[in-house]
């Protein structure tokens, strides 16, 4: 008897933490990266969840700091022939899908994502085959192969609007891979949504009891929550949204103190947006518990200065993203559907 893959039961080994650099080493690699970016006609795109010094370097060199889709869109529009993607592997794949003519380099191809790992293509394809009457919607945090199996790709910033649209057409949905985001979208729309049971190892760790205690210490603080968090955390929020939406909420809310329930990498850009406000990390461990991620993705942490310099200098199979042409074509269709839908929302 075959046993169905259970993302909730999967344990993903974390990578070792990068060796800390001293100030002289940091300066050496910063200068080396700046030189290599010019020599390779490259631009650096970094995710909000990378370390502050990486985001700062992206800014200083004319690059981009954003969510995964905007990183790829920025790279596609940029004149550079090479993109250095500081993030996790699916982000590099998305950049390659949208810019097949460009060289896509990453500090390491071992930078994974628990949502991606928790949705292997063979098991997910079988799951979809078992429900042929449903439209398949997958989150951007998936492999190129999973995207190619989908009808739509979606980001958290437009997930509710897209599912509302599909529901209005009478469509039933398969949602993958994040069960918390899928549950949030279902509750917001009332749509018929069948969720794959994956989760982000960072957001899944936020704890209601610990957060309640923190709220008592800071009773006038607003709570900002990413919808990849458990429902009990989302229900406590003053604002729920994607990374970019949370930064906007930080500016809009009148509160002087903000408790932020997402990866602490976002603090760099959020603090720039609201320098007058105090940002507080939401707790990730319950009573007597020890956090695994401690509100920072361990794979994002692999994007260190030394690794970025090595990626630019060495290139090759250890650093360059490749996507099979047929797979790219299959993944591009649902990605373009999403981009077209997002454009109608902005119109």
Swiss-Prot record:
Family affiliation: Belongs to the quinolinate synthase family. Type 1 subfamily.
Name by which UniProt lists this protein: Quinolinate synthase
Annotated Pfam families: NadA
Designated gene of the protein: nadA
Gene Ontology, cellular component aspect: cytosol
The protein's annotated pathway: Cofactor biosynthesis; NAD(+) biosynthesis; quinolinate from iminoaspartate: step 1/1
Keyword Oxidoreductase set for record: no
Enzyme class, UniProt record, top EC level: transferase
UniProt main location, coarse: cytoplasm
Catalytic reactions on record: iminosuccinate + dihydroxyacetone phosphate = quinolinate + phosphate + 2 H2O + H(+)
Keyword field contains Transferase: yes
